[in-house]
Amino acid sequence: MVTKAFVLLAIFAEASAKSCAPNKADVILVFCYPKTIITKIPECPYGWEVHQLALGGLCYNGVHEGGYYQFVIPDLSPKNKSYCGTQSEYKPPIYHFYSHIVSNDTTVIVKNQPVNYSFSCTYHSTYLVNQAAFDQRVATVHVKNGSMGTFESQLSLNFYTNAKFSIKKEAPFVLEASEIGSDLFAGVEAKGLSIRFKVVLNSCWATPSADFMYPLQWQLINKGCPTDETVLVHENGRDHRATFQFNAFRFQNIPKLSKVWLHCETFICDSEKLSCPVTCDKRKRLLRDQTGGVLVVELSLRSRGFSSLYSFSDVLHHLIMMLGICAVL
């Protein structure tokens, strides 16, 4: 009887250790907000439970969130840049924040391959009333595990002086009230990936709030195509950069608001497996098999006149870029 008890106990322990089905998708979602960084990875990566994964190798603060394990760095203020092992670097006027999520099991043996999800957020700093305000320009993700190798990609949002998109326009910049209706030129660019991957601009919409789900919205681009004649998409799905232009504007009849936020959802498409170029006379596009990582990039541009989401399935990234142009009229 005692022997049977030990056998049952061993079987129970083994079953408990395999309570989650190993997920072998190399996917990471990174939300880089001005004051907070949120990172998500698919639950049970390579068989690891959430309590076995540590943010910065120090904090076991992951929680289940809609099929993912979520880790939060809640404070990027100068007094707390090292939260849970977060590393920071300041090279004026740029702030870099680095962290990682690693597997860490204290049992006698380990049967799951180790994982290491490293990520960073890069911010362009400005100073208002002696407090640092971050305007993000770049987000970088680096994934490493025991058998699948590594990948690293860098995404950036840039403004340009004209439709040639050859000369970048450094932010922040000032626009006068008389410039409402003038053209603004923007591009979403991916770096660190091979030429087989193309940037595909899916949708862009504007809100009078930094919240991309704000109920009052003005659609600019839908399914890769302009919604009216004031928006022009130059390159979409043909290169490592998607470029477009739109007329500067502001929302009416909204008291005490001087900001308009432009939100753009962008995909990185594997051109060897999918047809990436977007043709606007054929609105139906293949956007299946998207599982994954979201990088949120928020950029605030100050002006005086008005203002203005990457999955990895066989390497398919999904990015949400948020661009805000502050306006004072």
Curated annotation (Swiss-Prot):
Keywords: Cell membrane, Disulfide bond, Extracellular matrix, Glycoprotein, GPI-anchor, Lipoprotein, Membrane, Secreted, Signal
GO cellular component: cell surface; extracellular matrix; extracellular region; extracellular space; plasma membrane; side of membrane
Modification(s) after translation: The presence of a hydrophobic C-terminus preceded by a potential cleavage site strongly suggests that tectorins are synthesized as glycosylphosphatidylinositol-linked, membrane-bound precursors. Tectorins are targeted to the apical surface of the inner ear epithelia by the lipid and proteolytically released into the extracellular compartment.
Removed propeptide positions: 306-329
Matches recorded under Gene3D superfamilies: Zona pellucida, ZP-C domain
Pfam families (UniProt xref): Zona_pellucida
PROSITE patterns referenced in this protein's UniProt entry, alphabetically: ZP_1, ZP_2
Keyword Nucleotidyltransferase: no
Domain ZP: 19-283
InterPro entries assigned: ZP-C, ZP-C_dom, ZP_chr, ZP_dom, ZP_dom_CS
Record-annotated disulphide pairs: C204-C264
Entry keyword Endoplasmic reticulum: no
Cellular localization per UniProt: Cell membrane; Secreted, Extracellular space, Extracellular matrix
Domain of life (superkingdom): Eukaryota
Glycosylation sites: N80, N104, N116, N145
Membrane topology: Lipid-anchor; GPI-anchor
Signal peptide location: 1-17
Assembly mode: May form homomeric filament after self-association or heteromeric filament after association with alpha-tectorin. Interacts with CEACAM16.
Function: One of the major non-collagenous components of the tectorial membrane. The tectorial membrane is an extracellular matrix of the inner ear that covers the neuroepithelium of the cochlea and contacts the stereocilia bundles of specialized sensory hair cells. Sound induces movement of these hair cells relative to the tectorial membrane, deflects the stereocilia and leads to fluctuations in hair-cell membrane potential, transducing sound into electrical signals.
Comment, domains: Zona pellucida domain may enable to form filaments.
Annotated protein name in UniProt: Beta-tectorin
Organism of origin: Homo sapiens (Human)
Lineage of source species: Eukaryota, Metazoa, Chordata, Craniata, Vertebrata
